């Protein structure tokens, strides 16, 4: 699970979230791995990974060396080992783009992919985040001309046309999950935006107090079928982009 737009400079919100997850959740224990605060101005954000420590382990991570200063918030790349014979490791590359520089940042994201896959010699990579890749920030023509669209091997799991915004007045596919690697893509069972206002019976305003985006997720099958029967959901890896769940309670965003 990857959280974005975390602006907590006191470093108190994530420990609180972990404490509550491990207190009430029955699928833990959970651990976290965070970047530094990133940004060009006084407003800064961090990327935060949350993961089940008995199912995954951080093998390595690094902040992308953005020598040309193309990213407002350069990706914090992480390589996980997984307790799965089907998918023993996975690289995640999160990015929250700036609306005015979406095209430049998303094309530069391809270079981050090359850097990460070359560093760890893997093709199983997921690029994910609030790409702002729709509506006024990026036209369909410019979207289709991105390197991540024209280069073979990438599957945009959150399809064009999927609304990832909470407001009824908007219908934009800002948030994306992009899978690279034939093997990884073969494990994909589903992808969706999670309409949490509907699931939790919230009004639009109540939902906006939490986030103006829906979380997006992919479902990966991490166990082989036995006698033709697919494994249950517990044998899958869920990756969610939360922007940001429980924000009002935990102070994850301003």
Predicted regions and their residues:
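Divalent cation-coordinating acidic motifs and surrounding scaffolds
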Residues: 1-254
């Amino acid at each position: 699970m990857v959280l974005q737009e975390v602006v907590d400079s006191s470093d108190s919100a994530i420990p609180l979230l972990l404490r509550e997850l491990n207190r009430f959740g029955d699928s833990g224990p959970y651990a976290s791995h965070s970047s530094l605060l990133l940004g060009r101005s006084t407003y800064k954000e961090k990327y935060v990974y949350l993961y089940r420590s008995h199912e995954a382990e951080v093998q390595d991570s690094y902040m992308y060396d953005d020598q040309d200063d193309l990213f407002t918030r350069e990706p914090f790349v992480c390589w996980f080992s997984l307790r799965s014979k089907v998918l023993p490791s996975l690289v995640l590359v999160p990015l929250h783009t700036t609306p005015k520089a979406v095209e430049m940042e998303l094309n530069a994201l391809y270079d981050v992919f090359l850097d990460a896959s070359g560093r760890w010699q893997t093709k199983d990579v997921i690029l994910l985040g609030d790409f702002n890749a729709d509506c006024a920030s990026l036209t369909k023509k410019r979207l289709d001309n991105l390197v991540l669209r024209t280069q073979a091997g990438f599957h945009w799991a959150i399809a064009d046309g999927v609304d990832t915004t909470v407001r009824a007045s908007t219908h934009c596919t800002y948030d994306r999950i992009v899978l690279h690697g034939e093997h990884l893509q073969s494990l994909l069972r589903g992808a969706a935006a999670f309409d949490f206002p509907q699931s939790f019976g919230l009004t639009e305003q109540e939902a906006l107090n939490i986030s103006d985006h829906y979380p997006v997720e992919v479902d990966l099958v991490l166990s082989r079928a036995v006698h033709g029967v697919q494994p249950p959901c517990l044998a899958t890896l869920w990756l969610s982009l939360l922007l940001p769940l429980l924000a009002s309670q935990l102070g994850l965003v301003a």
